[in-house]
């Protein structure tokens, strides 16, 4: 793998591997992206970066702002990493029955954790995030309703012709199935 100058540029720049064992008698070539090789360890790095960058472009947030988000895991870890890279204070709200490893990963990137009860669940976490925003205690990215979340996958990963896979496979393969 080539050297990449910043963590941000590494997000989504994950290896392509050719799947060797396909069912049936086929000559098709199927490539998979190893999204676990993203810096925070999951495909959620893409939408975390997208939600923050697009909100910056719209002038909704700027470095130094407090971001508040409800999460149960990988998106929170990825947001913690991106927030740290870009200079945001991040408060993550999650149910108290989420794994200790997830909590530790978020805190390792500098996020503050606010726990709600397991009974309140993700709905309670999201309600608290929205209340904190209404009270002026932070800005919510709202991964659950934010179009920049799914668009990150559409723009960078799911499209066969997207820049990341297209650049990696070169001109050896067609750009449409």
Residue ranges: model-predicted function:
Residues 160-163, 167-177:
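Single conserved hydrophobic/aromatic residue that forms the stacking wall/gate
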Residues 1-162:
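PLP-dependent amino-acid enzyme catalytic core
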